[in-house]
């Protein structure tokens, strides 16, 4: 059994991209926001 810390198992950004690290942490949430937007839109039009 191999034990890895989180950074080794997921991977590190290359050094040139380290300023974008906080942005990369947020990017996977964006599709969920579109899903939430679809429900809000349907609620606004009363689920026609």
UniProtKB/Swiss-Prot annotation:
The protein's location, in the record's own words, is: Plastid, Chloroplast thylakoid membrane
How does this protein sit in the membrane? Single-pass membrane protein
Per the record, its GO cellular-component terms are:
chloroplast thylakoid membrane; photosystem II reaction center
Transmembrane listed as a keyword = yes
Q: What is its main location?
A: plastid
Residue spans crossing the bilayer: 23-43
Biological process annotations from GO: photosynthesis
| Pro-peptide region(s) | 1-11
The UniProt keywords, alphabetically, are: Chloroplast, Membrane, Photosynthesis, Photosystem II, Plastid, Reaction center, Thylakoid, Transmembrane, Transmembrane helix
Q: Which domain of life is it from?
A: Eukaryota
In terms of SUPFAM superfamilies, this protein maps to: Photosystem II reaction center protein K, PsbK (SSF161037)
Q: One Pfam family this chain carries?
A: PsbK
Q: How does it assemble?
A: PSII is composed of 1 copy each of membrane proteins PsbA, PsbB, PsbC, PsbD, PsbE, PsbF, PsbH, PsbI, PsbJ, PsbK, PsbL, PsbM, PsbT, PsbX, PsbY, PsbZ, Psb30/Ycf12, at least 3 peripheral proteins of the oxygen-evolving complex and a large number of cofactors. It forms dimeric complexes.
The entry assigns this protein to a family as follows: Belongs to the PsbK family.
Q: Which PANTHER family does this chain map to? A: PHOTOSYSTEM II REACTION CENTER PROTEIN K, PTHR35325
Per the entry, what this protein does is:
One of the components of the core complex of photosystem II (PSII). PSII is a light-driven water:plastoquinone oxidoreductase that uses light energy to abstract electrons from H(2)O, generating O(2) and a proton gradient subsequently used for ATP formation. It consists of a core antenna complex that captures photons, and an electron transfer chain that converts photonic excitation into a charge separation.
HAMAP family recorded for this chain?
PSII_PsbK (MF_00441)
Name-wise, this protein is Photosystem II reaction center protein K
Q: Quote the gene name from the UniProt entry.
A: psbK
